[in-house]
């Protein structure tokens, strides 16, 4: 039985059962098999529509529901998943993307600083998708405050 068959059977039998749970700050979020399958199908169809049938697609990211859905979208379609260790340095990831003949990449926001290097050094790479929406660095209700120092007439430092 193929993974695609197992996944589709799980959705039929357990559609509303929670397939994954994860912690987002202090809130426990969850997704059912049916909810996940919608994103898996969207990923699969999107890859085919963009001409990636039969191609190798790399994934670099930490454990997340988006990573799982992307991975399942790749392996249940006509594409080959190349999951790469997110802890590897940029140079090694570039080497693996090239050696695997990956033509597209799913990338976590944590690895966005590597994006320019990937695009410059991976000639087969045609498309990159970010795995998660970027979250603001500051939680809501927190403000940046800056204290500048200058000197007064007596050359004493004063905060302004």
Cite the ranges covered by each PLM segment:
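AMP-dependent adenylate-forming
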Residues: 7-31
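Conserved small/polar residues in nucleotide/adenosyl-binding loops
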Residues: 149-154
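Short amphipathic alpha-helical/adjacent loop interface patches that line ligand
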Residues: 33, 40, 44
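Structural core segment of the AMP-binding/adenylate-forming
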Residues: 76-145
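Conserved AMP-binding/adenylate-forming
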Residues: 29, 44-88
């Amino acid at each position: 039985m193929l993974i695609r068959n197992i996944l589709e059977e799980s959705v039929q039998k357990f559609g509303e059962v929670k397939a994954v749970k994860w912690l987002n700050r202090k809130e426990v979020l969850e997704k059912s098999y049916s909810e996940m399958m919608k994103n898996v199908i969207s990923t699969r169809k999107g890859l085919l529509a963009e001409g990636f049938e039969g191609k190798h697609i790399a994934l670099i990211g930490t454990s997340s529901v988006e990573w799982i859905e992307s991975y399942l979208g790749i392996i249940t379609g006509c594409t080959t998943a190349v999951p790469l260790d997110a802890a590897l340095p940029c140079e090694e990831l570039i080497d693996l993307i090239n050696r695997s003949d990956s033509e597209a990449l799913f990338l976590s926001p944590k690895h966005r600083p590597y994006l320019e290097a990937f695009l410059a050094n991976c000639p087969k790479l045609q498309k990159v998708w970010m795995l998660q929406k970027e979250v603001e660095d500051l939680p809501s209700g927190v403000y940046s405050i800056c204290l500048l120092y200058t000197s007064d007439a007596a050359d004493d430092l004063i905060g302004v």
